[in-house]
Each structure stands twice: as structure tokens, then as C-alpha cells.
């Protein structure tokens, strides 16, 4: 129904208004600018899933970081006032530091009783009719309506012996055995035999705070670990340990993520903490020790699943197929990786968190004068505003719609392109890719289209194979041939002197060379010997 009204609203808008829209105030454009500038992106597409709920962007719990909180005293007013915004909470595989703003206690085997107002019934003694429980004395506002259980006892002067008892939300140390025109709820056996509850904040009973204040909070996430040290935890715990109203706020970019009331501590029949499905959290920029209970952590904004996917592309036609392949790989990774195949820097996450929080603040401020339930209304208006921004971006031509995603183009200078004609020109390959559905077949077709035709190469396949084999094994055969020839030559030189000595010993006898003396360097002795031999 909400989407129909949005489309009707857009259809009635004049086109010049859409073309002259202030894109700097558009949430889709703002998110894209933060992602592009924080990660130095250029010449690519940033695709967002269409937002129909604010949980399309979710908050992640942060592990190790330094955080400087802002502290203040007094009744929180203005920007320090806590107005919750329910957001989706990312599943964390790591333990994160969390803090119980108020300590839990076990209600089992505790003495507890509250009063029933019976004076209006003109009764001087018990019992009070069932259902006439004095809410001002029996429960805190915001807790479920107390269930009245009958309980039998026989105090003197009270007939019949039936009274009623409301389960206590917080323990009291006093006991009044003289009701005097009131029915007292005495200690007895509950239908729920045991349960764990959060204590009320220390400054909850401050006189200047409205009595109808709803205590907010519950368990946050299974990833929470109370034992992990963190500087902000000790500071916040020490600051809130006071009966004086105090508040604390996160720096820009960070938020408090606190457990909602729908998450329950253990009770009879459910020995473990129960969490909502899907996991949600209450987002605050400021919390106080007046109304906040339960478990809180600090977090940042991140995309949900593959809510944001980065597609790389290039301008030249010959490289377009390569961009298509990269896009397919990015989409394939995005289906597996929790961050859409893209790494977000800490600065980017803080800026995204700050932007979404600014939108939430302006949304809450715009409806602050309404007397309706501001918590649920803030979420509805927030959803509608984000959805409207996305639809305005689509109608204005700033984003190209592909596969149910709204894609904005980051130009060569790293800025979000707002020229409709340029966006249309650059979106040609994106639409072609979208028709393929980022499937393996589409990627393979892109690879084949990028390669030239192989028909002309078939006749050359045989010679090319021979040449390839020669290149591979030719050096080995050449080295082997060289070694073989060198070995034969060496053997030939070693046998030659032996043959000469053998021939000389056969031609002349032993007496033939008896007058030969060793040669000197000039050969003179050899010539003299030969002359004597000739004589």
C-alpha cells in the first residue's frame, strides 16, 4: 500500500521538478558518494537493492576500536533525547564487547508484594474483585499488563479467604501486614516458578521525569561478550552508576545498538536467552540512566547481504568484455561474501553510519510534534523516505535500474555522475550484463565474444604444434648433441700420442735411437745427433 502511494506521488510530480532535484540531499546519491570517496573508486557502477524497509541497511557490531563518548548530566533534551529506531542487525562471527546497562537479577525465591486499591469498592478488607489491580502501585509502565493469580490465605478478619497477587517486576525490601482498606499481595508460589529480569535504571524514579516513561532494553545478540574489555564500557558503567539523571552520546559515525524488549532473558520453560528472528536492535545516538536497561554495544552501518555491489567497467570497446567478466566475478563473490565481494574501510562505514543517522534524526524531528507512537512512526516514515529517494533517483535518471537494483555511475574523476545522457551511454553494457543474470553462462559468453574467431587458425594448428614442440624440446636435443660431439673429439685426441709412439718403436730397433739425447728448447741436440747418425 505504501509503495502505491509513493508511485502515485511520483506520477503527479512535474518532470522539471525531478530534473532539478537536489541530488546532494538524496540518500541514494549520498550513500554512493560516501562509498566512492572512502574507497577511491572511479569508472565503475555502484548498485543498491531497492529499499522498501530501513533494514535494507543494517548495523554491524564493532570489536576493537577507541571511542570517546560525550557525557552530560540532567534531563536529556533536544538532540540528547533518546528516540529508538529499529534496525536490522548483522550476524557476527566474532565476539564483541557489550555492556549490561542494568544488572539482571533472579526473581526466584524472592519476597515481593504490591497493593490493590480497594477503597473505591467500599471494602474494608480482602478480597478485591479479580481484575481491580492498582496499576500505579503494582507495575511499571511499559511492562506487560500484570496477570492476576488467585492465592489463598486466612488472615484474621478477612472473609472469604481469597485474594489476588500480581507478579513483581522489581524486588522490594518492605512488608506491610496491615493493608487497611487495601488487599495485599503476599509472597506465594508463582505460575512461572523462576525468571531473570533487568533491574530498573538508578535514575528511573527521578521526580522531573514523566511517570509514563517506558524502560527500554533487553538482550542484544549472541555475539555479545561482557568480559571483553573496552574503554567505553568502563566509562559508561561508572557514569551511569548514579541516582542523578545522566546521558551519554556517541561521536559522529557511531551509534549505540541496544537489545529490544522482544528479546527475553531466561525464564521458566525457556532456560536460554531468546532473540528475535531476524535479529534486530534499537539504534540510539544517546542513551541515559533513566529509561535504558539491558544490553548495549557500539556499531556502524553496513550494507545488508549484497545490498551494495561494485561493478568494474572500462570505456574502450575492446576492453568492455573484460569489464563484464569482472562484474560477473564481483556478483558471484557477492552471493557468498557478507559484504557483496567488497571491502569497506572504517572511514567509509563511519560516514555511512553518520549519513543514515542524519536521515533518521531529521525524520524524527519532522514528526516530533505528533502525538502518535513516535517509535513505530519514525520507522515507517524512515522507510518511506528512503524508498522515495530511491524512486526519485530512478525517475530522475540518476540511477539505472538493472536486476531490481538501482545503479549509479562513478565517473573517471570519482564523482557520482548526474548527467542523464552520460549515464544512459554508460549503462549500455550494464543492461546487457543484467540480461545475462550474472550467470556462469553469461560470463563464458562474454569471454568468447572477447576472443577473435578461430576458424583461420585451424590449418595452422599442425605447424604451430611442431614449432611449439621444437621450442620446448629443441634446446635439450641441441645440448645432448654438443656433449656427444665433444666427447668423441676428446677421445680422439687422447688416442693419437699412443699411436705415434707405437709406430716409432716398430720402424727402428732399440739400437737405432741409442744416440738420441733429450731435446733442448731449440732442438740443437736433436740435429747434432742426426748428423752423427748420417756419418
Swiss-Prot record:
One Gene Ontology CC term in the entry: membrane
From the Swiss-Prot or TrEMBL record, state where the protein is found: Membrane
**Where are the bilayer-spanning segments?**
322-342, 457-477
Keyword annotations from UniProtKB, A to Z: ERV, Glycoprotein, Membrane, Signal, Transmembrane, Transmembrane helix, Transposable element
All ranges on the Cytoplasmic side of the membrane: 343-456
Q: What is its main location?
A: membrane
Q: Which residues lie on this side of the membrane: Extracellular?
A: 22-321, 478-535
Tissue specificity statement from the Swiss-Prot or TrEMBL entry: Expressed in placenta.
Identify the domain of life.
Eukaryota
Tell me if Membrane is a UniProt keyword of this record.
yes
Its membrane topology is listed as: Multi-pass membrane protein
Q: Name the glycosylated positions.
A: 68
Signal sequence bounds: 1-21
Family indicated by similarity: Belongs to the gamma type-C retroviral envelope protein family.
Protein name, entry field = Endogenous retrovirus group V member 2 Env polyprotein
Lineage, top ranks? Eukaryota, Metazoa, Chordata, Craniata, Vertebrata
Amino acid at each position: 500500500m505504501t509503495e502505491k502511494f509513493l508511485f502515485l506521488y511520483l506520477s503527479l510530480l512535474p518532470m522539471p521538478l525531478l530534473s532539478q532535484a537536489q541530488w546532494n540531499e538524496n540518500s541514494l546519491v549520498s550513500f554512493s558518494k560516501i562509498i566512492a570517496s572512502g574507497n577511491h573508486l572511479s569508472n565503475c557502477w555502484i548498485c543498491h537493492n531497492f529499499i522498501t524497509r530501513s533494514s535494507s541497511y543494517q548495523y554491524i557490531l564493532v570489536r576493537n576500536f577507541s571511542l570517546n563518548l560525550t557525557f552530560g548530566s540532567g534531563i536529556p533534551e533536544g538532540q540528547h533525547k533518546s528516540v529508538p529506531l529499529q534496525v536490522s542487525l548483522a550476524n557476527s562471527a566474532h565476539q564483541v564487547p557489550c555492556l549490561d546497562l542494568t544488572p539482571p537479577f533472579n526473581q526466584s525465591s524472592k519476597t515481593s508484594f504490591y497493593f490493590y486499591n480497594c477503597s473505591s469498592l467500599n471494602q474494608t478488607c480482602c478480597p478485591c474483585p479479580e481484575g481491580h489491580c492498582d496499576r500505579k502501585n503494582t507495575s511499571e509502565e511499559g511492562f506487560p499488563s500484570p496477570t492476576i493469580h488467585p492465592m489463598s490465605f486466612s488472615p484474621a478478619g478477612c472473609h472469604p479467604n481469597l485474594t489476588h497477587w500480581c507478579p513483581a517486576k522489581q524486588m522490594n525490601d518492605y512488608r506491610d501486614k496491615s493493608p487497611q482498606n487495601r488487599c495485599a499481595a503476599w509472597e506465594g508460589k508463582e505460575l512461572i516458578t523462576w525468571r531473570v529480569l533487568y533491574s530498573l535504571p538508578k535514575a528511573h524514579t527521578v521526580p522531573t521525569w514523566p511517570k509514563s516513561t517506558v524502560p527500554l532494553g533487553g538482550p542484544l545478540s549472541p555475539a555479545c561478550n561482557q568480559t571483553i574489555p573496552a574503554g567505553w564500557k568502563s566509562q559508561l558503567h561508572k557514569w551511569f552508576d548514579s541516582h542523578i539523571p545522566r546521558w551519554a552520546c556517541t561521536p559522529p559515525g557511531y551509534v549505540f545498538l541496544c537489545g529490544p524488549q522482544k528479546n527475553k532473558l531466561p525464564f521458566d520453560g525457556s532456560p536460554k536467552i531468546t532473540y528475535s528472528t531476524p535479529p534486530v536492535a534499537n539504534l540510539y545516538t544517546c542513551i541515559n540512566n533513566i529509561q535504558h536497561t539491558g544490553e548495549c554495544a557500539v556499531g556502524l552501518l553496513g550494507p545488508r547481504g549484497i545490498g551494495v555491489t561494485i561493478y568494474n567497467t572500462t570505456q574502450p570497446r575492446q576492453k568492455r568484455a573484460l569489464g563484464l567478466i569482472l562484474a560477473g566475478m564481483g556478483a558471484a563473490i557477492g552471493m557468498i561474501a557478507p559484504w557483496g565481494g567488497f571491502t569497506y574501510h572504517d572511514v567509509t562505514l563511519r560516514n555511512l553510519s553518520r549519513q543514515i543517522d542524519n536521515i533518521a534524526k531529521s525524520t524524527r524531528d519532522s514528526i516530533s510534534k505528533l502525538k502518535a507512537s513516535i517509535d513505530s512512526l519514525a520507522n515507517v516514515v524512515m522507510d518511506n523516505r528512503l524508498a522515495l529517494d530511491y524512486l526519485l533517483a530512478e525517475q530522475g535518471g540518476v540511477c539505472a535500474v538493472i536486476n531490481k537494483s538501482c545503479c549509479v555511475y562513478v565517473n573517471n574523476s570519482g564523482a557520482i555522475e548526474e548527467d542523464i545522457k552520460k549515464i544512459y551511454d554508460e549503462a549500455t553494457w550494464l543492461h546487457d550484463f543484467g540480461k545475462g543474470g550474472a550467470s556462469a553462462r553469461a560470463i563464458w559468453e562474454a569471454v568468447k565474444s572477447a576472443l577473435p574467431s578461430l576458424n583461420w587458425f585451424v590449418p595452422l594448428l599442425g605447424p604451430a604444434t611442431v614449432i611449439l614442440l621444437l621450442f620446448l624440446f629443441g634446446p635439450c636435443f641441441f645440448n645432448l648433441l654438443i656433449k656427444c660431439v665433444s666427447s668423441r673429439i676428446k677421445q680422439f685426441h687422447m688416442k693419437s700420442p699412443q699411436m705415434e709412439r707405437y709406430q716409432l718403436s716398430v720402424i727402428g730397433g732399440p739400437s737405432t735411437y741409442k744416440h738420441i739425447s733429450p731435446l733442448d728448447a731449440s732442438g740443437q741436440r736433436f740435429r747434432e745427433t742426426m748428423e752423427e747418425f748420417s756419418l
